[in-house]
Amino acid sequence: MNALFLLKSKATVSVCYDDNTVRRGMESLRDSGFSAIPVITRSGDYAGSVSEGDFLWFLFDNPDAKPESVRLSTILRKGWNPAVTVNVTMDDLMQRAANQNFVPVVDDRNKFIGIITRKDILAFFYGQEESGRNGTEGP
């Protein structure tokens, strides 16, 4: 099974840019309705992901900081929610989904191409399990 089958393309995913301000990032996250959002560079590289908790801790740890003056790139946690390439296995996706709401996907040049959600990963595996029980072939 090719993981691209589950991909939500960049065009349909809410993202922030690493040069946005923290305030703009918070607004984008609120508007998205999600608890975390991918962050990319202006050239399309995946820079990381930012969560509600990242914003909360930034405000808590920096009470005098002005969110409209601080770049989003300064609050990104290194190594959190790392991206996978299109060659990722379904087993690797399942392992990532245990700890992440979505898995960012990049091409071989680290260009962000979209996400695969935990919901879609679980639905895929549930479908495989169901088809095995019914004696039919899965997706």
Where are these regions (language model features)?
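Helix-adjacent hinge/juxtasegments
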Residues: 40, 61-71
